[in-house]
Amino acid sequence: GVQTCALPIYFNSEKAYDMLKKLNINPNDKLKTMSKGTKEKVQLILVMSREAKLYFLDEPIAGVDPAARDYILNTILTNYNEDATIIITTHLISDIERILDDVIFISHGEIALEKTVDEIREDEGKSVDSLFREVFKC
């Protein structure tokens, strides 16, 4: 699921309606009639329309088709508050690696690695996805 944290939270309905329109999603449609990918997009639109200092996105691209993944990642990149921090939990590292600045690997509740993407590439000589697979034996 997608969540956000901030007090107070300001919701920009104009931004939300604009994103819905770009995707040809009728704001009057019921969620139960939408596909999983469309529901994920609507959830993300609702989150990214908030003016928050911290966005927590829990597996935002899990279980959606590649086109929906691209839309979700582009929505994250183009609609968040630039003064905000975005925390993304995911197992789909290769799909989000291009948008990452910093990486934390957590194993059994402990931090296994904490580096910038550039440090991983320079120090380890590999992609974040390759290092993830190595650390977690995927």
Predicted regions and their residues:
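Catalytic Walker B motif of ABC-type/P-loop ATPase nucleotide-binding domains
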Residues: 55-59
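ABC ATPase "signature
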Residues: 114-115
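Short, small-residue-biased leader/transition segments that mark boundaries at the very start
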Residues: 1-7
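Helical segment within the ABC ATPase nucleotide-binding domain
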Residues: 69-82
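A short, surface-exposed alpha-helical micro-motif characterized by mixed small hydrophobic
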Residues: 96-98
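Conserved H-loop
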Residues: 84-92
